[in-house]
Swiss-Prot record:
UniProt keyword terms in alphabetical order: Chaperone, Cytoplasm, Stress response
HAMAP family linked to this entry: GrpE
Domain of life: Bacteria
GO molecular function, one term: adenyl-nucleotide exchange factor activity
Keyword Cytoplasm belongs to the record: yes
Family membership: Belongs to the GrpE family.
Record-linked Gene3D superfamilies: 3.90.20.20, Head domain of nucleotide exchange factor GrpE
Oligomer and partners: Homodimer.
Protein name: Protein GrpE
Keyword Cytoplasm listed: yes
Length: 185
């Protein structure tokens, strides 16, 4: 090291020499031809926008589907419970139908069963459970299950002439079909 470097510190650092880049003068694109890079960028932007719009639409559709699924889950949550109550309702109705005596004890029993049945029907209505009792109606395979066919007699062909067991709907969804006898032609 030289004495000057020791007293003054190292000398000024050498500056890098500027690089000389040969640049061609920018040529203006001919008036009739658009810049290829600009067209590609616009096309890419258009494709990206299209993807974005499709993704937004897909998300909105998914949100709507999920909302509908949640609504249906709430609406039909009672389905299993309601199906379990149907035999209880049937038994009450049969018990009332069987209690035809005039004895005071039978009358009290019948009255209690009728009040219980009335409460059941009220609860069913409250929760959207409707009775399907198609006696005299046209046979509907979506709500009725034909157990037998009988000669028509006075009834019109393909109408329900007897109901073995009532059917039930939960918010217009079939819980149990009505078991019926249908008039033959």
């Amino acid at each position: 090291m030289s004495e000057e470097e020791l007293t003054n510190g190292p000398g000024p650092e050498p500056q890098p020499e500027p690089l000389e880049v040969e640049s061609a003068p920018l040529e203006a694109a001919p008036a009739g031809e658009p810049d290829k890079a600009l067209l590609e960028a616009q096309q890419q932007a258009s494709e990206n926008w299209d993807r974005f719009v499709r993704a937004q639409a897909e998300m909105e559709n998914l949100r709507r589907r999920l909302e509908k699924d949640i609504q249906n889950a709430h609406k039909y949550a009672l389905e299993k419970f309601a199906k379990e109550l149907l035999p209880v309702m049937d038994s009450l109705e049969l018990g009332i139908a069987a209690s035809t005596g005039d004895a005071p004890d039978v009358a009290k029993l019948r009255e209690g069963a009728e009040l219980t049945l009335k409460q059941f029907k009220s609860v069913f209505e409250k929760f959207g459970i409707a009775v399907v009792d198609p006696l005299g109606e046209k046979f509907n395979p979506e709500q009725h299950q034909a157990m037998a066919m009988e000669p028509a007699g006075e009834a019109e062909p393909n109408t329900v002439v007897k109901v073995f067991q009532k059917g039930y709907l939960l918010n217009d969804r079939l819980l149990r079909p009505a078991l019926v006898v249908v008039a033959q032609a």
